[in-house]
Amino acid sequence: MSSYPTPVIILIGPTASGKTELAIKIAEYFKTSIHNIDSRQIYKFMDIGTAKPSKDQQKKIKHFLIDIEEPINQINVQQFQKIAQKSIKREINQDNLPFLVGGSGLYMNSITKGFFIPDIPPQNNLRIQLEELGQKKCWELLNNCDPLSTKNISFADRIRTIRALEVFYVTGKPLSTLKVQNPPNWKVLELGLDRDNLKERILQRTKNIFLSGIIEETNHLISKYGFDLPILETIGYREAKDVLKNHSTIDKAIELTTTKTIQFAKRQKTWFRNKNNPIWLNNKNLLKDAIIKIESFLS
């Protein structure tokens, strides 16, 4: 294998910024596939609430790292890192241009920068104590001991909040400060997508998600795995679950989901600027600007 660094293209951006649509156009132009770096799209049966690429989009362009596990089987950052790196290596060995797309900064950096993620088994006693405290208190604890991680973890994401607290309490080190270990021999171009009208896009996408059937999708997940499925505590699904319980209305669920998503997108943008420092694309002509930058990078 060549000792020269392998070129790898990355497209990052906050939720609802239009990554999927732009990524497909880029992949079509460069005749390559897409590796989805997303902490929820890896799970089966969660298509609407995660805004997963449609079946038609997946037929048009091959997508990796989508629907790789059932939601009852939680995948942590370390497990995802291993799965993703293996998939990307396979593409490199076939002389394909690796193209990574996602909004999860921690997951992306674990792959591209080689962050060492400690292999800490679930701490059952600790988890019981944390779950008794409730998500609000756990997120506040995490924000106190590891504020950088909360910039990339939604306030409603109980799974990743508890996992980050486990890492801190077991190792004594915040998850966000874990050092790079054996970074891959890649030459990486990071492109950033950030829309001026992001709040409006988030509101529209949230409406579309509820109109498209997130409540029915949530009901299906509940019937298959039960009300206590942890992933149902994440943004969108939690609000849909409250509607099913008659604790909320659809209008209130849309409003709350929109508010939480806007807050999460703000934290994503802060993470990208602090941890990634991408080249931001020109919003007036995204595809043209992306192609110019990628071709220059590859030449």
UniProtKB/Swiss-Prot annotation:
Binding site for substrate: T15, A16, S17, G18, K19, T20
Name this polypeptide is given: tRNA dimethylallyltransferase
PANTHER family linked to this entry: TRNA DIMETHYLALLYLTRANSFERASE
Keywords: ATP-binding, Magnesium, Nucleotide-binding, Transferase, tRNA processing
Organism: Prochlorococcus marinus (strain MIT 9215)
Family in the record: Belongs to the IPP transferase family.
Listed EC numbers: 2.5.1.75
Entry-linked NCBIfam families: miaA
One Gene Ontology term from the biological process aspect of the record: tRNA modification
Binding-site residues for ATP, renumbered to this chain: G13, P14, T15, A16, S17, G18, K19, T20
Gene3D superfamilies: 1.10.20.140, P-loop containing nucleotide triphosphate hydrolases
Lineage: Bacteria, Bacillati, Cyanobacteriota, Cyanophyceae, Synechococcales
Assembly and oligomerization: Monomer.
Role according to the record: Catalyzes the transfer of a dimethylallyl group onto the adenine at position 37 in tRNAs that read codons beginning with uridine, leading to the formation of N6-(dimethylallyl)adenosine (i(6)A).
